[in-house]
């Protein structure tokens, strides 16, 4: 959420930075609400100070010998009671304006980092680096073709069970999914991450804190009777782990890793990636999440990205790193690196992880602070996929396919899968 003080003191900066995202905003209405809220706050504070002064004066006069039931003291007490009534009215008005202002601000995205390159769309994203040698050969199959030939998944039965964009994994496919999850969790916990297994159902406050609500409600599945939602990413419950908390500065950074099923409606993606594992309503993902001191978030962004890259390197999967431009940033992000893995069958790079620094945007929405001595301030948060399991499996199938119909797996997976090949059954 945007800083209300910044809205009052420097609205031009907000307009300029949102303009870098391609937004043309008129903040006049928000500024008016913020000014009214600030004026009410000042009037209330002034009246409270006057009420405290009168209360103190009552005590002093009684101590000096005035009759506690006399007219002099009664008049002061009457003034004090009248002030209390006015304060109560102002508090109610102030709460209403504060809630209105918060509701309006919740719909605005984060301001981009100064380091984020300007641009209008994904065409303006900047390639940062590449790793590995992409396999380029004629006649390579796409992952869904390989998966069907090896009987790894069944989409027709999944439609019968649920609907389109769901898959059921069988045999080697189910084993490989489990192996990848365990491999990734072990890799990250070996680097000091604390493993978390969060709830799959989250409340509206959690989705609001991470930035999914109110703007993206149509993209998630909701259990309306209970005010619960199927989580679209473990980023949501991980953000709320410390909602409404003050984290001592000597405990930072906090680094969490979580496996969770993820659920997305994929609104607006009709006709795209209709086969295979790339775009599903339900998929598994291992998520990385950091809470850091504000002064260390840029450094942490490089580190969390490197941790996501380490998975691809261990699995011997070629990839490239893109820095997203301002016009392609996610709602909560101030700066983002996308990792795109090479899919040899498709002959293209596809996104497999987004690693974002969200500055204090999520922390302000979730009231997550840190305290260093007498100073209390909002933390910074970061998140990144480490990695999406289905897309990782797709990359392994396409890059490891062999002429005999088998798929060669990287050595790092052998202890988890039990052998180095997927064989036709």
Curated annotation (Swiss-Prot):
**Where, subcellularly, is it found?**
Cytoplasm
**Keyword Mitochondrion applies:** no
Family from the record: Belongs to the class-II aminoacyl-tRNA synthetase family. Type-1 seryl-tRNA synthetase subfamily.
Q: From the UniProt record, which GO molecular function terms apply? A: ATP binding; serine-tRNA ligase activity
Q: Which domain of life is it from?
A: Bacteria
Q: GO cellular-component terms in the record? A: cytoplasm
Pfam families reported for this sequence: Seryl_tRNA_N, tRNA-synt_2b
The record's region (Disordered) falls at 108-134
| Biological process, per Gene Ontology | selenocysteine biosynthetic process; seryl-tRNA aminoacylation
Q: Basic and acidic residues compositional bias: what residue ranges?
A: 117-134
Query: Regarding domains, what does the record say?
Result: Consists of two distinct domains, a catalytic core and a N-terminal extension that is involved in tRNA binding.
Gene that this sequence comes from: serS
Q: What class of enzyme is it?
A: ligase
Q: Which UniProt keywords apply?
A: Aminoacyl-tRNA synthetase, ATP-binding, Cytoplasm, Ligase, Nucleotide-binding, Protein biosynthesis
Chief subcellular location equals cytoplasm
Question: EC number(s) for this protein?
Answer: 6.1.1.11
Detail which positions bind ATP.
264-266, 351-354
Q: How does it assemble?
A: Homodimer. The tRNA molecule binds across the dimer.
Q: Which CDD domains is this protein grouped with?
A: SerRS_core (cd00770)
In which residues is L-serine bound?
A: 233-235, 287, 385
- What is the protein name stated in its UniProt record? Serine--tRNA ligase
